[in-house]
Every structure is written in C-alpha cells, then in structure tokens.
Amino acid sequence: MDHTDEYIKEISEKIDSKKEYYVEISNKIWEFAEPRFQEYRSSELLQHVLKQAGFSIKADLAGEKTAFIAEYGSGKPVIAFLGEFDALPGLSQKADAAERIPANPGSCGHGCGHQLIGTGTLASAIALKDFVKEHNLQGTIRYYGCPAEENAGGKAFLVRDGYFNDCDLALCWHPEQGRRACYGSTKANFRVFFTFHGTPAHASMCPELGRSALDAVELMDVGVNYMREHMIDEARIHYAITDTGGDAPNVVQSRAQVLYAIRAPKITQVKELYNRVCNIARGAALMTETTVEIRQVAAYSNLISSKILADHMNAYLEKLGPITYTEEEYAYAQKFQQSLSDQDKNQLPTIARDYFGPKAAEVMKKPIFEPMAYQNLYSDLKYSTDVGDVSWLVPTVHLNIPTFAAGTALHSWQAVAQGKSSIAHKGMLYAAKIMALTAIDFLQKPELVNKAREELTKTLNGETYPNPLPKDLKPEIW
C-alpha cells in the first residue's frame, strides 16, 4: 500500500508547525554571520536546538572547534544530514535593502545561504526523528554540523578522520535558481598559499642589495597566466595577493604572499595542475633570488551524485509541486532583480535556458523561478563543495531550491540582503520536507540503501577516495 500522500502530509505538518521557530533560528545565524572555523554562536545554537529535540551531541571534532554530530536512534541505515553555517568575509549587508548598504562594514555576510542550509537540514532531521519514533522504525539519524565550507573545506577533515565511515546515505541542499536534484558533479579544488621571502633594502640608495618578494609574486602570477593556454578548458585558477609586503615603495619587499585556488573536474587533474603551479612558483623564486614556502590549507574533491537518491528527490519535488508566493513576494523579488547589474540582467536568459530549456521564456515572466528544472540535470557545476569528499564514501544527493529572486548571484550582497525574507524561509522549509521524505523511503526499504551503495561502487569503477589533504594538515583560521 502506498502511503506517500500520508507521509507528505505528516512531514509537512511536523515542519510547518514549527515554522516560526525555524525562521528565528535561521535569522539568528544570519545575524551572527561568523567566518570559517569561528562559527561559535551558530554552532552552539544548533547544538542546543538538537539537544532539546532529543539528539545526543559530540562536539569539537577533527580539530574543528565548531564541528559537531547530533545523533538519534540506532542501527542501520545511518542517514547523514549535512548542515553548514559559515558566512563570507566582506559581505555584510542590511537585510531587505535593494541597494548596497553594509550592516557592519568589513564584516561577514551570508552570501551563500548557509544560515538556510544549516537550519533547513536541522528541521529535516528533527522531523525525521519524530517520524521514526512515532512509526517505530529502525535507523540512525545524524546531523553533521559542518564548519568552514567556504574556502577551508571543513568536511574533508571530518572525512579524513573517519566520521563518515559508517554512514549509508548523505543528504544536503543548497539555495539555487531552480528546484531540482542534480546528477552532475562539481569541481575539485586546492587552496594553496605561496609565501616568498626576500631581502629588504632601500629601493633608491642600494636597490642592488634587495631581493623583492613582491616581484616573485608578480612573476608567479604572470607565469600562471601564461600556463592557462596549456591546461584543460574545464580547469579554473584564481588568485588573491594576501600580502604585498607593506605600503612603503622605497623599501624592497622582503615578504609577499599569494593565495591560489586551483580547480578542475577531477581531483587527479587538480593535483597535476598544482604541481605545475608549484614549479612556476619555484621558477619565480629562482628568477628573483628569493625563497618560496608552499602551504596547502584546504582541498575539495569532486562531487559524485547518487542518481537513485536524486530520482527519489525529484519525484517528491513533483509531488509537492511548486512553492507558492504572494504578490508582495513577487514585488520583493522584482525589486532585487532591478538592483542587478546590467551584466547580471543579461545573464538571466542564459540561466533560464540552462535550467528550463524550451520553457525558459515562459518561466522568466515571474521574478522567481518556480517549475521543476529538468534541463541539464547531468551538467557538471562550476563551483566546488566539500560535500564532494563525503560523496566518495557515502551515496550523496545535493538538492537545489530557490530562495531568492531569479538572477541573484551567490556570494553577492543581494543574496545576503534576501537571506531573511519570506522567500528564503519558504525555500528552506520546502527543502527540509523533501529531504525528510526522501530519507523515509530509504529507511523503510533497505534494498534502496543497497542499490545506492552498488551504484556508487559501479560509478567509482575501482577508484578509491584520493584523500586530497596532506596527512599533517590541521584546520586553521587564516
């Protein structure tokens, strides 16, 4: 007998009945806006809520003070919900303001919706816990409090230290332009500091005695830019000069530093590019008679999506139907669409085609993309996520739900500004329902868990997880 409609009603009621509570939690995390590995208040709040809901807590994991696992139940399957809560530096923004108004200039802001991710997965885990208890089901529900997704890859440290070894499924979600569970991958990624050390000297009186670390940084950047012609099209390399050596031009800079992000579709390709970039850095040091210190601080593996999990999620997306919005919410979204740059506005048709194909023109008539986004489900994504590291060990699904005006770029002030809106909260609670309903299918049918594991084994085709972190690397605030 099919109980799908009953379960949809039950899970929806469990989540909707606590709507104001979850909105308050999300808004508090938005206000905390704490950077990577410093999400102390956000982590404490989430732990408190889960403990109150009947979960046991293990905290301070893998050298990450703000990481934790909340657990309920026992036995198999072990279902992991991946929560995030770190904010982005320099993106502070006044809520609901459709113009650039930093709330606290220079501070962090939630430009990637992690306050929604952390709270939405929490709501889903609690609803599933209540369902399991009431229906007397066996299984273990875990909420993973995952810090530092941005720039530091916090999950990779948790994976390396074995915290996912006994998991059977992993569910997560992310704000995006359309409703869908994708089958595609994300880019693998290394984050590496190159610090050059030279010799200071008076730049006019005795420049011949100086050896410029800043020259080395600039030569390295030029060398990498020439390398771009000779790497695969799908690769991306970005850099930020984090230390120019000071602000005195009459002193030869004795220290300078640059941070590189190296991306490619597969971790093996990233390693190859990394070795080439390191050689360019050594060459720059040789040319300038400086020395270079190379320090990798983070790594992200490419995502391996579970089609079986995604199929179940997409079926529930169809069953639940589109999120409904009010005229006031459409007007709110329209206001933010108008705030976009001309370049961003010109990208809207392309975004709509990527998500909705031939339906793009019709979908664009509203300022929030509503239908199922079936176009390009197999397309690989341009960004990186440390969910990828989990996915090499555990069948994993990555759900996308809209939480902002169509065309809003992630990591933008517009994304921060809309983070406390009713549009954002509707998307968050909708995602919570989809994840809980998907988990119920796999709790009740062990054969689905086995199929998901078999699918992952087949996809890997003999490959083993190439843990990209150096063995001695510890999480650090940088």
Regions from the PLM with identified roles:
Residues 2-110, 115, 119-140:
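Acidic/His- and Gly-rich active-site-bordering loop/insert found
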Residues 5-6, 24-28, 99-107, 196-204, ...:
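A short small-residue
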Residues 7, 18-25, 38-49, 77, ...:
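General structural feature for long, well-ordered alpha-helical segments within catalytic domains
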Residues 29, 70, 81, 114, ...:
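Divalent metal-coordination and catalytic microenvironments
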Residues 34-35, 144-148, 297-302:
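Conserved short loop/turn motifs at secondary-structure junctions
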Residues 80-82, 91, 197, 399-402:
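Non-cysteine beta-strand/loop elements that form the S-adenosyl-L-methionine
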Residues 218-478:
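Metal-dependent amide/peptide-bond hydrolase catalytic core
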